[in-house]
Every structure is written in C-alpha cells, then in structure tokens.
Amino acid sequence: MAAVFLVTLYEYSPLFYIAVVFTCFIVTTGLVLGWFGWDVPVILRNSEETQFSTRVFKKQMRQVKNPFGLEITNPSSASITTGITLTTDCLEDSLLTCYWGCSVQKLYEALQKHVYCFRISTPQALEDALYSEYLYQEQYFIKKDSKEEIYCQLPRDTKIEDFGTVPRSRYPLVALLTLADEDDREIYDIISMVSVIHIPDRTYKLSCRILYQYLLLAQGQFHDLKQLFMSANNNFTPSNNSSSEEKNTDRSLLEKVGLSESEVEPSEENSKDCVVCQNGTVNWVLLPCRHTCLCDGCVKYFQQCPMCRQFVQESFALCSQKEQDKDKPKTL
C-alpha cells in the first residue's frame, strides 16, 4: 500500500510543482502591477485594500463669486459680415467692451501685465496694456440681474471679410466684462472677465464659439475657465424652462472649476447621480480629464476615471461637507 502511494506521488509530483510555481508567478505579477499603479484584475485585489488614498491627491480649492456671465446667442448665425449676438448676465452693473481684431500676442502680454504690473479692472487699463493693437472697439452698459442681448458688428466701412489664414495673429473678437461701479470692485475677488471668441469668416469657417475665458482676480492672478464633463439626467424631460435651468447649473459648475461660485440652489430634479452607485449626488471632479461623475462615497475607491479610464492625478469637491449638510432637509 505504501509503495503504491509513493509511486503515485512520484508520478504526479512534477505537475504539482508546476502548478504551485505558476500560481506563485501569477500572484507575484499581480502584486507588482498593483504596486506600480497598473490595472490589475479584480480577482487579484484584496477587497480591504481597494482604497487609493495615497495615490490620488485632493486639490485644495477656494470658492469665490463670479459676477460675470457671457454666452453666444444663435452661434450658427454669427459671422464677420453679419455680426454676433452676445447674452450677458451680471450680478452688478457692468461694462461690456468688445475689441475686434485684437492682437494675439498683445492680449497675452496684457494678461501677464495684470499679474506683474497693474490690475486690469477697467477697459482703459486693458487698452493701455494692448497698446491699442485692435481694429475696432465698441462698449455697452449692462444692468445688473438682467439678461441682455447685445448685437455687435464691425462697421461696414472697415471692409474686413477675414483675419487671414491659420495661424492667425489676431483674434476675431475679444469681449471684456468689467464692473461699472468702482465700489463694487472692492466687494468681489473677480474684477474682470476676458472672453476670446472665434467668429467664422471667408477664410476660416470654424463654427462660432468661445475659445477661452479668463477670470482676472484683484490679487493679480488670472484663471482659465474650464468646462466640466457631466452625464445628463435621463429622467428629466427637456423643455424650454428645463433647458435654462440646466444652463444655470452648468454655468455654476464652470465657474467653480475656475475658482468661482454661483449662488444657484441645486434642485432635486437637476441633481446628477453618481455613475457607479447611481444613488449619491455627483460631487467630485477628476483631473486632468475633468469628468464629474463620482459621489463622496465612491471617489475613494477609484484610481482611474470610470468614464475614460485615464489615471486620476488630482481631484476636488464641488461642495464641502458643510454645504451638503445645509442642503439636506431636516427630519424629525
């Protein structure tokens, strides 16, 4: 009996050793891949070690109020010859100054002067920084809390039909929003907003759009306003009213990513659900992809964006825990 057992063990021992070595190799490979941050199959992960708090850094944000709002009305109908319609939405009386054919180089030199030399809080300050390197200027007074449509157009006697071939030395239109009352400039951290707008012409027919928006702060910094990518709520029926509400919500998110905040109270029907648990409210922005798709409970379990699979370098919350507690209804 013992002899038969020893013979059987001798016959199967090579297969047993091979299986043990192969299993050890798979486990070791999984641990090494996980240590260096590569994707590892879920079966090799320890359920108690799926939080990546040491990998993803939480970016400290400072929220400030943005008194300016600017959008393009009917961008499909805009052109150099027919002009463009802009819609403003400002919290205080403001001035909208439009510069046609503004020099690209002089504009970015002006932004640097805002940081190192003098603050651009008035149209005259920007014009001094630009050294009048623009073709035409027009200015409009904007009343507070009133959405006004402003029609801007180059004079016909200029006979400008395009701004040359790409790459260009001039932007078609640069719109500057500043506070009209000097006292209001002491209230807000954001003292002006510069919008770079592309308008199609005979040479370059790219559709009309806002290329860049820069928020200029009283402390001397300026920040590029970036769009967040958020999935739409499918339970929500589109209408004219709902469209305006979505725009207001999107605007507040855009302002927050550019170090600004709009006092728009989030309604229940406009709330966005987490793409993972489908329950929690979306609150975290993942960088650098800018997908806004995770709630407070799920963000700690992800090292890669669940939308695009890009590795998350930094993240920040749209609302602090205190703000969320205020929004929650009190129950007895």
UniProtKB/Swiss-Prot annotation:
Subcellular location(s) of the protein: Nucleus; Endoplasmic reticulum
Protein name: Cell growth regulator with RING finger domain protein 1
Keyword Signal included in the entry's annotation: no
Cysteine pairs bridged by disulfides in the record: none
Described purpose of this protein according to its UniProt entry: Able to inhibit growth in several cell lines.
GO MF assignments: zinc ion binding
Cellular component GO terms, alphabetical: endoplasmic reticulum; intracellular membrane-bounded organelle; nucleoplasm
ZnF region ranges: RING-type: 274-309
GO BP, one annotated term: negative regulation of cell population proliferation
Keywords carried by this UniProt record: Cell cycle, Endoplasmic reticulum, Growth arrest, Metal-binding, Nucleus, Zinc, Zinc-finger
Induction and repression of expression: Up-regulated by endoplasmic reticulum (ER) stress triggered by thapsigargin or tunicamycin.
Domain of life, source organism: Eukaryota
Tissues with expression: Ubiquitously expressed with high expression in testis and the cerebellum.
